A protein has these predicted regions:
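Flexible, charged surface loops at secondary-structure boundaries
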Residues: 6-10, 57-63
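Short active-site-proximal "capping" loops at secondary-structure junctions
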Residues: 20-21, 73
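Active-site-proximal helix-loop-helix substrate-binding element of RNase H-like nuclease domains
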Residues: 31-34, 38, 42-51, 59, ...
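Conserved "right-hand" nucleotidyltransferase catalytic core of DNA-directed polymerases
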Residues: 1-19, 28-30, 35, 129-286
């Protein structure tokens, strides 16, 4: 039912995967595109593109549903191409989280496919392509290009199969929900991931001079604040809150009889407990 509704709503339904260089995890770099592979699911047409630039996406934004596993990656690459983001996204990673969050240990493409018995390349081979072929090189010969495109296509095909399996499971889990409702929820989730990628790509302007001043002076500011506060409530020692001193403060305020304790009998010092008593005790509120 969902597939039929999607086919009615969109002229094109496209599974898309990209490969790119860049250290987004640690250095926050923008994607350096290597390739993109698209498969239009209605016709089976496959489009491959290799290179850092792309003049236009192969299918029009207002008529196409783009399917990706972790939309943020494809959205980042799209922006790195200098293109406007597509309007409609279906994120198979997010849909897997909706179905299985808290039930499974991973939501990566290979893990998702394994649960549905979808054939994929091995995790070891995937690591080989990423860490030994794609990331270490800035240029690629024809043989390397062909291997990378084939690898990218294998992910596209795997995600296509995952998409179909997800539709089947969603229809079972949400059997009382209308297809349009399910689709709208999925599109909203996909759009939110694309929007997040846009924020990350554009960055947030920072007053680096002011930030540096704050970072340089913060230790001294913190020390002064702690000293001033400690003169009033006496719970710190060398800048660190001490349990014995905290206990005495609670005792001074006649709260020992009502203060919650841990399983070991210690006074609780979690944020929720502190907030609760801060409403009626000035020392705690400080």
């Amino acid at each position: 039912m969902i597939w039929e509704q999607l086919c009615n709503d969109f002229k094109y339904i496209v599974a898309w995967d990209t490969e790119f260089r860049g250290d987004m995890k640690d250095a926050g770099e923008l994607n350096d595109p290597v390739c993109s592979v698209f498969k239009e699911l209605k016709s089976g047409t496959v489009t491959k593109h290799f290179g850092k630039t792309l003049d236009a996406l192969p299918y029009p934004s207002n008529e196409t549903l783009y399917i990706a596993h972790h939309v943020g990656a494809e959205a980042h690459t799209c922006l790195s191409y200098g293109l406007k983001l597509p309007k409609y996204w279906w994120d198979t990673l997010e849909e897997d989280k909706k179905l299985n969050f808290g039930k499974v240990t991973g939501h990566g493409l290979l893990a998702c496919c394994k649960r549905y018995n979808i054939q994929t390349i091995s995790a070891e081979l995937k690591k080989h392509f990423i860490h030994e072929l794609i990331l270490p090189n800035e240029t690629y010969n024809d043989e390397q290009k062909s291997k990378i495109l084939d690898y990218c296509l294998s992910d596209v095909i795997a995600n296509e199969e995952l998409f179909y399996k997800q539709l089947e499971e969603i229809e079972k889990v949400k059997k009382y929900d209308a297809p349009k409702t399910i689709i709208h929820q999925a599109l909203f989730a996909g759009a939110s991931k694309a929007a997040t990628a846009k924020v990350e790509f554009d960055g947030i302007p920072i007053n680096t001079e002011l930030l540096s001043t704050i970072q340089t002076n913060f230790p001294a500011i913190k020390e002064t604040m702690v000293e001033e506060l400690n003169a009033e409530i006496d719970v710190f020692e060398n800048g660190v809150m001490k349990y014995k001193k905290f206990y005495e403060m609670v005792k001074r305020n006649d709260l020992l009889s009502v203060w919650p304790v841990t399983a070991t009998g210690q006074l609780k010092t979690d944020e929720k407990t502190i907030f609760q008593f801060a409403q009626n005790c000035d020392d705690i509120n400080k």
